[in-house]
Amino acid sequence: MDLQLKGKNAIVTGGSAGIGLAITKALAAEGVTVTVPGRSKEKLNKALAGIINVKAIVADPGTAEGAAALIQQVPDTDILVNNLGIYEPKPFAEITDADWLKIFEVNVLSGVRLSRHYFPRMLEHNWGRVIFISSESGVMTPPEMIHYGVTKSSQLAISRGLAELTKGTAVTVNTIMPGPTRSEGIVDFLKNVSSAPNPTPEQAEKEFFEKHRSSSLLQRLIESEEIASLVAFISSPLSAATNGASLRAEGGLLRSIA
């Protein structure tokens, strides 16, 4: 299928690792010129080596200064994928104000700052795609990291609110809700929540789904490419009828039918 994306421009935050890297590759393969911001030029170059149609920019969208630097270097884009995010399992009573502020700034304000600039321009051009990479945690708050769940819920609200402003235009704003996905850091996360003292990655994954995500129909980690393929379609002109949606790619974790 031709997604009709050739010649478009995209920004993918957090686009040099995990789900973000898979999204970068998927869009680039469709002929999109993808800009990937990051904190380290060396790490960006290493992660993006060999990918056609990609540009690395040293700027951290997780800070106000970094977002401003990115906007200065790339004033316009057709597609904005707000993928940047962090997470940390932590008992609720131990989550400090600093923890709350940090995760909110990275997970929520990074997308707010960039959308505040690029979204009005998309409306002016009468075409654009804003995509927030949220999580099933946005509607099924994980007790092991409540602060993370709050940020993912916030993304759902922001996305739907922006979509309401697109009425009658060719701009769409949607959210993707991945479930637990195989990416950098997931092995350590699974070990941290495991009851075993030193589980193998396979044991930790099995226990996680049995104890913490028992409603999953997939009963395994999702591969990053399985998320990226959905993002590529939602980025496409072919997805024009999908707007203001929270799209599930969580392996059937959520039991509701709507």
Predicted regions span which residues?
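Residue(s) in the substrate-gating loop at a strand-loop-helix junction
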Residues: 135
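Active-site helix of classical SDR
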Residues: 115, 151, 159
